[in-house]
Amino acid sequence: YAPNELKKDYHEYALPFTRGNYAAAFDYVIKKYISDCYQLQFDKGSKYYGVKGGKPAVILLCTHWHDARVVYNESIRKLSDKWGFPLVKFDEQIGFSKTVEHPETHRQTSTLFADDTECIDGVEYGWHPNRGKDCYIQNRMAAVFVAQIQSLVL
């Protein structure tokens, strides 16, 4: 996250983005979505036509499912703070941390719950979580997400 790389207007960004700057890519999408929602007040075919401010832009950001994705997670937290958007903190609530290896496998616990792995700073972590209604991570993430949504609605 480098605030000096974020543009004032989404039109100022050069497309496509590279993976090197998550914050700029998210900033672009956020600004474009908010602008598109705002413009609906002028669209005669929109149900938000004539509504001051257009469609309310509701945005919820999420961290990666575990805490090894430090650059991504830090960037998304800063964007959440900048914009005042709610943040689903999967990395803090998933049930394990990169700071402690699994006591039996002596590997990162995330590898037990992933279909594949990725190497970050020489350490192997789970990359894409197992999918399916009976998979622990999917159920855990769903519970964390639902709890966050309920806290916003109540």
Predicted regions and their residues:
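Alpha-helical cap/lid subdomain in secreted, periplasmic
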Residues: Y1-L154
